[in-house]
């Protein structure tokens, strides 16, 4: 969410050509709805992940994406943090929403594991460099 917030709310789009988001909670996560006070105290940002949080309402006023920035969203079907997984996609024109498993069939990578997985990191580099990424669906 921080990257989307920077680009839109802090005028960061003037400084960014390509943005790659990993498993973003742009539409919230059902885990944030868990009425577990201990979780909220441990994870202060979890309240912002609630689908109806003030942060998400502010971010989603109008388009999330900004003109002039190429957006890619990388998602793993194995995510157990931002659920349902489809909530991670930005459903706006020009956004390339990608399941890692569409590029790497059978790939087992978790939400946090995306940060350490060399094949995922290679995909990020290609996207940042503007290289074409072909999925089974395009």
Regions found by a protein language model. Name each.
Residues 1-138:
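Lipid deacylating catalytic domains
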């Amino acid at each position: 969410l921080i990257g989307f917030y920077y680009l839109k709310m802090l005028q960061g789009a003037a400084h960014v050509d390509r943005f790659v988001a990993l498993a973003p909670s742009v539409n919230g996560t059902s885990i944030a709805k868990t009425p577990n006070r201990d979780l909220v105290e441990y994870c202060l940002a979890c309240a912002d992940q609630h689908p109806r949080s003030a942060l998400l309402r502010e971010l989603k006023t109008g388009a999330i994406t900004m003109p002039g920035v190429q957006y890619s969203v990388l998602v793993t079907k194995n995510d157990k943090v931002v659920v349902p997984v489809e909530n991670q996609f930005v459903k706006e024109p020009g956004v390339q929403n990608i399941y890692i498993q569409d590029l790497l069939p059978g790939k087992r990578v978790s939400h946090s594991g995306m940060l350490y997985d060399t094949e995922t990191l290679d995909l990020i580099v290609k996207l940042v460099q503007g290289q074409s990424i072909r999925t089974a669906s395009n």
